[in-house]
Amino acid sequence: MSEKFDCHYCRDPLQGKKYVQKDGRHCCLKCFDKFCANTCVECRKPISADAKEVHYKNRYWHDTCFRCAKCLHPLASETFVSKDGKILCNKCATREDSPRCKGCFKAIVAGDQNVEYKGTIWHKDCFTCSNCKQVIGTGSFFPKGEDFYCVTCHETKFAKHCVKCNKAITSGGITYQDQPWHAECFVCVTCSKKLAGQRFTAVEDQYYCVDCYKNFVAKKCAGCKNPITGFGKGSSVVAYEGQSWHDYCFHCKKCSVNLANKRFVFHNEQVYCPDCAKKL
């Protein structure tokens, strides 16, 4: 008499039927799905005996459920990467390890044009001016805190403007009486000589180099007839009755004693000491 060939679970005869042998036991397909089948970690349904199964590190999937966690590309017949419990295709795994753009927060992968500044990175087209929103890319820019400005917007928003030409001072420049100038704009009003770092004289908001001030502006000493410049020797001036003298030229017409800061007598457009004036 032949041995019974029945399902281990439901005892239905298996003769002439499809069955599965598991752990030395025979079972019909229905009981296999109910009692023996692995559960797909993706869809949570049993992986039936006639379905294709993918197995990786004690986890099981239907072959159609085994996809990249990012792009959902099927991976049953392709290489893949396991990262932090997620199954990824090679392309998405590379992106996961790539730095993120500060602008769009997307991955910057090999071959992407990018801009890096102080450890932060952007796609080239994501690196834009905080004011006009135009792409700065690899062009010149000015950082201000967390913001970045193109040259034009920085000049408009932050740069000092020259009091003469009213254009932005982007580098260098000088300050005189709390007013900013381009070095090339701060010049002698007569000869256009640059005055930065040079001696000059201001007269009614006009600026003169030493030579032009001497020749065209300075008063002439009533004694020596030379210009009174205020530079070097003779910087002290004596003024009286609309006339001016170098302090060293202000002396008695007769005895030549210097009268700067002393009593004197002015007679017939001439200067005398008191003693000589008595003898006139």
Curated annotation (Swiss-Prot):
Positions bearing N6-acetyllysine: 4
The record's section on SMART domains has: LIM
Cross-link Glycyl lysine isopeptide (Lys-Gly) (interchain with G-Cter in SUMO2) placement:
86
Zn-finger (C4-type) residues: 7-31
Q: Where is the LIM zinc-binding domain?
A: 40-92, 101-153, 162-212, 221-276
Compartments annotated for it: namely: Cytoplasm
Q: Which GO terms describe its biological process?
A: cell differentiation; muscle organ development; negative regulation of cell growth; negative regulation of G1/S transition of mitotic cell cycle; negative regulation of G2/M transition of mitotic cell cycle; positive regulation of potassium ion transport; regulation of membrane depolarization
Work out whether the entry's keyword set contains Zinc: yes
Per the record, residues carrying N-acetylserine are 2
| Protein name as catalogued | Four and a half LIM domains protein 1
- Species of origin reads Rattus norvegicus
Q: What is the lineage of its organism?
A: Eukaryota, Metazoa, Chordata, Craniata, Vertebrata
